[in-house]
Amino acid sequence: QKWTAEGELLMTLGTPGKPAEKMSGNPFNMPTDVSVATDGTLYISDGYGNARIHHYTATGELIKSWGEPGDGPGQFLIPHSLCLDKTGNVYVADRENSRIQVFTADGQFVREWKGEHRPAHIWQGPDGNMYVAELGFRQGLTLDSSLYPEQPSPHEVSHPSGVKILTPLGQWLGGWGMSTDTPGDIIAGHAMAMDSKGDLYVGETLDGARVQKYARVG
């Protein structure tokens, strides 16, 4: 839904209470994120009940959709977040495939970054770098059997959550977070936002249940 800053409803996409059939590819079944391009068009990750990215005009007309369940290029297992860079490329946090996929504005696959720990949110900062919040894995975690028919052993899923900073090409620049409740560490990073000063706000789910602010230095 689109609202004014005063809370007036301007536009609704989809029909509230009537989701599309699960994994049908049709909008929407539990969408996860939306990003607005410089031309006003909308990109929506339709992630929890679909494996799809939808591109809409500023007035709500569907332009194109792409994606299907799987782990190949252009396939997704919970596309949980997306953002656009300054050239219009679309970065998708493909959470349960533990990777970031990059597409052109019209949905053509460009590249992928592997090795993320269940990336839940991606954001481009004013410095041009990409910030990725990782939900992470932990010992004893049971994964969705519909996505992982063969459950990994606990030692295979004991990767901490945190925030990574990468270039737009996926080169690692830094990061932090050790899955503890110590202030500054991150438990299950789930969403992020950045203010005009470049300060970063990270929302944590599961045992975290808090929002932490990180001030930009330099």
Q: Where are each of the predicted segments found?
A:
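Eukaryotic scaffold repeat domains enriched in small/polar residues
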Residues: 1-218
